[in-house]
């Protein structure tokens, strides 16, 4: 961030730096619980009372309009969002109306997952293969899309993902809080990698730690100096 990079810039004295770090210590960071939270491979939305877990290797991000996910090499991606649909409209109709490409003939399946009605389908594009689902939870309809590069059908991972959609336990919902920025002191000889492992982030903790602290790759930490990390 701009503020993070400014900390290490010439002209910012030790007193100013100390005051800045004291001011941000404990500040909320990242997602607002009211808009959903990412915790590792889980997404939790107390307001909608839903949660799900993505398959191994996926890292997810909660954006304004959707939850997006990708694998490190980018060969698989996913999207979760909410769609407008009246309760009397069939899920198959909703699925077809919210997908612009062709749906493979005979691939639409209506089933019950976790007590909820679900319509799923397969769509094949030129470069990607898509698994689609529309799920009704109470009065709200959600869409889940998983894409795999090439002709590989991601059905196995897709089913595990859709089957993970569940209601949030009320007790867990009450405990959800935003992540926080905290200031920690590096020990003598402690490395960037060691301190970065304290970060509660969905992926790339080292890269995120470097950006947060205005450091370049390959930088060494100074024992006794304060650094910012993200924690629960």
Spans of model-derived segments:
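C-terminal capping/extension segments of zinc metalloprotease domains
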Residues: 1-51, 59-68
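Stable alpha-helical elements in mature extracytoplasmic
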Residues: 3, 16, 20, 90-95, ...
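Secretory pathway targeting signatures of secreted, lumenal, and periplasmic proteins
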Residues: 51-98, 123
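Surface-exposed amphipathic alpha-helical segments
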Residues: 60, 144-181
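Short, well-ordered beta-strand elements
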Residues: 79-82, 139-150
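Signature of long, low-cysteine stretches enriched in small and polar/charged residues
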Residues: 96-143
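Primarily a LysM-type cell-wall glycan-binding module
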Residues: 172-203, 225
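Extracellular LysM carbohydrate-binding repeats and other cell-envelope/extracellular binding modules
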Residues: 204-232
């Amino acid at each position: 961030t701009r503020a993070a990079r400014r900390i290490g810039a010439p002209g910012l004295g030790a007193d100013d730096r100390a005051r800045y770090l004291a001011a941000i210590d404990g500040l909320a960071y990242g997602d607002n619980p009211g808009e959903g939270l990412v915790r590792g491979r889980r997404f939790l939305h107390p307001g909608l009372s839903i949660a799900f877990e993505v398959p191994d290797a996926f890292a997810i991000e909660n954006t304004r309009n959707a939850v997006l996910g990708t694998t490190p090499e980018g060969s698989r991606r996913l999207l979760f969002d909410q769609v407008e649909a009246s309760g009397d409209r069939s899920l198959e109709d909703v699925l077809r109306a919210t997908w612009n490409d062709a749906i493979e003939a005979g691939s639409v399946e209506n089933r019950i997952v976790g007590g909820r009605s679900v319509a799923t389908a397969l769509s094949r594009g030129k470069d990607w293969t898509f698994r689609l689902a529309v799920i009704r939870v109470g009065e709200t309809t959600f869409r889940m899309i998983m894409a795999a590069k090439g002709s590989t059908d991601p059905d196995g991972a897709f089913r595990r993902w859709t089957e993970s959609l569940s209601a949030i336990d009320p007790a867990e919902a009450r405990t959800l809080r935003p992540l926080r920025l905290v200031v920690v002191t590096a020990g003598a000889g402690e490395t960037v990698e060691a301190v970065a492992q304290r970060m509660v982030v969905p992926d790339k903790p080292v890269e995120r730690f470097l950006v947060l602290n205005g450091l370049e790759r390959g930088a060494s930490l100074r024992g006794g100096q304060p650094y910012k990390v993200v924690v629960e």
